[in-house]
Design a protein with these regions (language model features):
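Conserved catalytic-core segments centered on acid/base and nucleophilic motifs
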Residues: 142, 190-196
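Active-site pocket-lining/capping segments in soluble small-molecule metabolic enzymes
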Residues: 1-139, 144-176, 201-332
Length: 332
């Protein structure tokens, strides 16, 4: 990096202050994957895939925030089929949550942190049914923001009532702020964990040391999550946080949840802009971290939809993705 050389001539060294690089990788040996959040329906997914082709980049995962419960069964099946063909993981937020309910607490200034949690036993029942409904359509990845719900879903998975290949992605709404909290979520059965978008590289290194699970991190976040814009930092974030899902939100964009037909045109425009931001970040990575490897479409460990009927009899195998420590040898 030419800038580091200029700093060293003045007796300064930015590289010496950077935490050590992670030796952990995704199962395919890659360092990172690209995620586009707030992909709220099939039309938005198709726009993301089209924009990715235009920029000649790979989007490995998309996530959705409005909730699986707000998509019709036919649309869930179409979403699963299109994503499966493209080799893209689709992670749907479990729909029922306090932020949608009758109670005022989660919509208050001090209670907003409860918006993603599930209220009461009936709420848990609805949430589990929402997952089962999406699983029947082929979806295999879910955003969870309630520790009790996570525990129940993992228990059902262990009992063979949910597919072994299902993944449980911890939402930024329940992001751990320290390594101990991250370890708790790891122990409850999370398969990938979103940490706060404003972590320093030192804090990212601490989080990485606490778990071998993939970490999800907003490289750019919407204003509701702090509005950080860190595309130029992608090489450092990946090197320190590997295996890392680099998420691209969009500052100065409107909130979308819950999305519907009245917002889908805006959701498409926002999603296209996010893909463009990811393309810019990858240019920065090529400039400053060319040895860092991104997973290909359909890579091992991605929870790509399986648009085939689920049955307990076929539900066998290891439920977790391995994380390897060997440095990959394949080119980027």
């Amino acid at each position: 990096m030419k800038a580091d050389e200029a700093l060293r001539r003045l007796g300064l060294s930015a590289s010496e202050s950077r935490p050590a690089a992670s030796d952990r990788r995704f199962p395919d040996g890659a360092h990172f994957r690209i995620e586009i959040p707030s992909v709220e329906n099939l039309r938005v997914l198709e726009a993301v895939l089209e924009e990715a082709r235009r920029h000649d980049i790979v989007v490995n995962r998309v996530s959705q925030g409005s909730g699986a419960m707000l998509l019709g069964e036919s649309e869930l099946r179409e979403l699963a089929a299109v994503a499966a063909e493209a080799g893209v993981e689709v992670s749907l937020f479990v729909g029922p949550r306090e932020g949608y309910g009758l109670g005022a607490h989660a919509r208050s200034a001090e209670g907003a942190g409860h918006a993603g949690q599930v209220r009461g036993l009936r709420g848990l029942s609805y949430a589990i049914e929402d997952v089962a409904r999406a699983v029947e359509a082929g979806i295999r990845s879910f955003l969870v923001a309630d520790p009790g719900l996570l525990m129940l879903l993992r228990d059902m998975q262990s009992a063979g009532e949910l597919p072994v290949e299902c993944g449980w992605k911890i939402s930024v709404a329940m992001a751990p702020s320290n390594p101990a909290a991250l370890m708790v979520l790891d122990g409850l059965g999370a398969t990938t964990i979103n940490i706060p978008s404003d972590v320093t590289t030192a804090e990212l290194g601490e989080m990485r040391a606490a778990t071998s699970l993939p970490i999800d991190l907003y490289v750019e976040s919407p204003d509701s999550l702090g509005g950080v814009v860190r595309e130029n930092e992608l090489a450092d974030l990946v090197a320190i946080g590997s295996p890392l899902y680099a998420k691209f939100g969009l500052r100065n964009s409107r909130p979308l949840y819950p999305a519907g037909e009245h917002l889908y045109d805006e959701a498409i425009a926002i999603a296209r802009a996010k893909v463009a931001r990811a393309a810019v970040a990858l240019e920065w990575l090529a400039r400053l971290g060319s040895d860092l490897v991104q997973s290909a479409a359909g890579a091992e460990g991605l929870r790509v939809p399986r648009p085939v009927p689920f049955s307990a009899e076929s539900n066998a195998g290891d439920r977790d993705d391995p994380v390897v420590t060997a440095v990959p040898t394949q080119p980027r």
